[in-house]
Amino acid sequence: LNLDQQIFSWAKVGFTSNLVYRDLNSGVKNTFTKSLSAIPLGDAYTEEGEINHEYITGQYSPMSDFIENQYVDNTRSTYLNVSGYVELTPVKDLTFTSRVNGTLNHSRRGQYWGEKCNANRPSYAGSPHASITNNNAWNYTWENILAYNTTIAKDHNLGGSLITSWNKNQSESSMAASSGQMVDQWSFWRLTSGTSQHVESDFAQTQKMSFAFRLNYSYK
């Protein structure tokens, strides 16, 4: 959504927004490398046409991650970016501009590793293992510019600007996980069904205020 409007001869406003929603299912990254070391014997599929997890005694298929309900990595995210400005010219040669930009980002990542899964899991994880990670972040920047530009005696250009900028960022995350689920179909939705739990959380914040002053002069 975009808007630019001249509301008075001395005032102009604008607004821009962008919203993105994503639902992403990610695959594993080590299937090909595991297939290079797999013994090229045995039956890759069962008589029912399903992937044969143990295709030779003691040898497990590099395709086991693709067995139904054995590996899940789903991320849902929402991103919002909004910016606006107001530009004022109260007197000739003097301009005041104020801009605000902000972003809001949320994501939920759900992962599940079944007993037959080959994909790397966290070092603390048992088998099966499931986790849900939530990330929230937001930031905004507010800038103000007071500018004066004039021409004296047709040949002398004189200008000056006073600039301020305020920025703040904040992010937080939480992760809950458990191991030992008995039903693969539960995926990452029933963490309380595991026999051992693991929890992590984090928070970070930064903020900054900046000032600048500039003078310009040019002849002809």
Provide a role label for each language-model segment.
Residues 213-220:
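Short, intrinsically disordered, charge-balanced linker/junction segments flanking boundaries
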Residues 2-81, 97-210:
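Surface-exposed loop/interface segments of Gram-negative outer-membrane beta-barrel transport/assembly proteins
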Residues 93:
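Active-site and adjacent substrate-binding regions of carbohydrate-active enzymes
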